[in-house]
A protein has these predicted regions:
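C-terminal helix-cap and adjacent tail motif
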Residues: 2-7, 11, 186-248
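Generic N-terminal amphipathic, Lys/Arg-enriched alpha-helix
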Residues: 14-31
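Short alpha-helical scaffolding segments that buttress acidic/His motifs in well-ordered protein cores
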Residues: 19, 42-46, 191
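Small-aliphatic-rich amphipathic alpha-helix that forms the alpha element of a beta-alpha
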Residues: 42-47, 105, 111, 121-178
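Glycine-rich phosphate/pyrophosphate-binding beta-alpha loops
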Residues: 47-54
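Glycine/small-residue-rich phosphate/adenosyl-binding loop
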Residues: 56-143
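A glycine-rich helix N-cap at a beta->alpha junction
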Residues: 81-85, 95-97, 176-203
Length: 248
């Protein structure tokens, strides 16, 4: 099938408009009610995502009960305080927005699906390496579905929040009983969405030239350990939370 240049460009421009308007907020207008149809449209987009071996190793738990949202928020508030006591120096977000998010979807996966990917299952060192890669395949697959859901929410006019601080064992122990998730599954992230409590702003992005390499990696793009440590110490918080001049 030959793609017409004008039609292809129009589709690209429409897609880029959605991608650019997908902005993170952490405080929502709690008065908005997400219609069931919007949940289904968002998850329909996720359903069509690519996955390793077409295993589709994802499950989505739609949380609409106010009490459940509050309990999820309470766990993350405890995590916020825990990080403060540990003096991690990480600019932890304000998790109270979890309770006010009109839309909330918990993303889970079953790591037994790594068996669908190239593995030996003989306990060898080579098998360990293959299984390590298989876990990456699974995580990449679920991330692709989650991103599709985020873009669908943005297309519907919502702002979003990708909550990732959920991999540690304490989070699993808190979330699984609360949501009736079987032990065999793992909670990977939470998607919040809705109209923002206040106008969002676009985060700083690296320029196209900084991230693009043709045929070989450009050594000028490599960073030393010291440069990365310097960025974390001086630029991370600005990149996460502040407006910047280099926003496109």
């Amino acid at each position: 099938m030959q793609i017409q240049d004008d039609a292809g460009r129009a589709r690209y421009d429409a897609l880029m408009e959605v991608i650019r308007r997908r902005m993170t907020v952490r405080a929502f207008d709690p008065s908005h009610e997400v219609p069931r149809e919007h949940y289904e449209m968002i998850l329909e987009a996720a359903r069509h995502s690519p996955s390793g071996a077409n295993a589709q190793p994802w499950h989505f738990i739609v949380v609409t009960e106010t009490g459940l949202k509050r309990k999820i928020m309470e766990y993350f508030r405890e995590e916020q305080l825990r990080r403060a006591k540990l003096k991690m120096k990480f600019p932890t977000p304000d998790y109270r927005g979890l309770a006010s998010a009109p839309g909330l979807i918990v993303v889970a996966s079953d790591f037994r699906w790594v068996r669908a990917f190239p593995v030996l299952n003989d306990g060898s060192e080579l098998d360990r390496m293959y299984k390590q890669n298989a876990e990456r395949i699974l995580l990449q697959s679920v991330a692709a579905a989650t991103m599709a859901a985020h873009l669908a929410a943005a297309a519907l006019g919502y702002n979003v929040w990708w909550v990732t601080a959920i991999g540690q064992e304490a989070a699993q122990k808190a979330m699984k009983p609360l949501l009736g998730i079987p032990d065999e599954l793992s909670v990977l992230d939470i998607m919040c969405f809705g109209p923002p409590a206040k106008a969002p702003y676009k985060r700083w992005k690296k320029s196209l030239a900084e991230i693009t390499n043709w045929n070989r990696f450009d050594p000028a793009h490599a960073m030393t350990e010291a440069q990365i440590d310097e960025w974390v110490a001086t630029q991370r918080q600005k990149a996460m939370y502040k407006d910047a001049s280099n926003v496109d």
